[in-house]
Amino acid sequence: MATTIRRVLLVDSVVWPPGLDPDPRRDVCGWFSRWTPHALRVDWFRVGVESNINELHSPDGWDGVILSGSPRDAWTDDPVNLQLGEWILRCRDAGVPVLGVCYGHQLMGRVLGARVAPHPGGLELGNTPVHLTPAGRASKLFDGLPDQFDVLSSHSDVVSDLPPGLVHTVAGTFAAIQGIQDSTGLLHGVQFHPETDPETLRLIWNPRRELWRPRVRFDLDDVLDHMKPTPSGRQILHNFLHHFVRG
């Protein structure tokens, strides 16, 4: 019996500082695709967030969609935010599952009626303890995970004030809402970064260290230099591809 090939679109929203030397490690789609379970056949495709996604990519052409993180502010009325928000709703209406990560989670929350704003405490970075809510324990996105686990974070905006129909799945201390799921079970968001590892997060942050040191209330270098891997991220991506992506 032939194995079904699942088509997954990665919407790459990462913005790199100008003037960086080429580096193959800055492959955002690869950060996600490397965790594909061996038992699944997945064809990965990447599209930049600034492309005209509503005209170029019909949701019907995909079995699943992942929205990457980004330094963009999901709470602004930037045209990129507006068009991607519209596309998220089109995916839901077409029955296509979507996983939003960090910025993707925030934008998803916004278009579903939640509040998104800068966190008054500023930046959350590095290893972060979180725990599942009752709704999170019931979600297949978190199959195989304990009630409490560590994740890797990199954000200063947060989702809050969830409307009816938007469920809180993962909780944290600094950012209370670390995961959401809509009433259809198609749209899932996580504030943290399941795709990343310490090396990748340092790759992102090394060009930004000097700028951010005076902005934060903790030892930025100590946090970045002593991050530990978080295997929970791989499990969450496995679960999304296995349980939700159409096959």
Residue ranges and their predicted role:
Residues 112-199:
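Pocket-forming structural segment of enzyme catalytic cores
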Residues 23-26, 59, 79-83, 112-116, ...:
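Short, glycine/charged-enriched secondary-structure capping and boundary segments
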Residues 167-171, 175-247:
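C-terminal and late-domain segments of enzyme folds
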Residues 68-139:
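Cysteine-nucleophile active-site neighborhood
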Residues 20-21, 54, 76-77, 109-111, ...:
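Short glycine-/acidic-enriched loop or helix-start segments at secondary-structure transitions
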Residues 1-94, 220-247:
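N-terminal beta1-alpha1 cap of cysteine-dependent amidohydrolase-like domains
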Residues 9-11, 43-45, 66, 99, ...:
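Hydrophobic/aromatic beta-strand patches that form the interior of the parallel beta-sheet core
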